[in-house]
């Protein structure tokens, strides 16, 4: 299949969005590639489509377990065999997934950066054809970025230890020059195609208000938008709990997400929001929005 057929058969789209085709063509030509695209612009398709056209396995490096799980589930539902390797798996599940990967069952494998330089994973990678390493949320490699993760520095070590260097692609919604340069330098991209798409988001409105009663103002806003979804950011976990409790008492479908909850509860609450079991989710400001691929009304 060509790229247009893959786009239609697996993802249901007739046309590519701005920048997607250029980035896909760059990867398929064997060039390292850096895509800077706003959230919701379809970054994932830029590495998923080439992955389905290349001979071998694509490793997708992702920082969040929840994000891996959501993307793998979406791929499986679309008819693409994909798997993830991270700390949420038991030892038996992890080794079974590796065994299936060796058999060629998965063209796409999502993996946590911490796993890359473990001996069992290195052994797998050295004895398997890895066509591409795609780094999602690539700004995590940069100390200029607000989401710097030291574990992302393991990516370069992993690539250097492979016998045959794969194509390397990196994607982020962070567009500052410092972060962009950092990504290219730290990941040692070789003469990469670099593409930044437009960041104009006509569907978004930003407003600043200072109401006397914040809760009543928020409640009135929600009542004016029945049946719509949204994220409410609070300064602290305590604020999240208080706001969610009040909203539930007032009859709103709401859940919560913050670091004070167990991994299992955070995952359940996130899935409740993503799959429409809860219209509203309250989060503290440190939680961010990565890993919640749901249209916000």
Labelled PLM ranges:
Residues 66:
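Conserved Rossmann-like nucleotide-cofactor binding loop
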Residues 291-297:
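Short "domain-exit" segments at the C-terminal end of structured domains
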Residues 1-2:
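Short, Lys/Arg-enriched, disordered terminal segments
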Residues 5-10, 14, 18, 22-44, ...:
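Helicase motor core with emphasis on the C-terminal RecA-like subdomain
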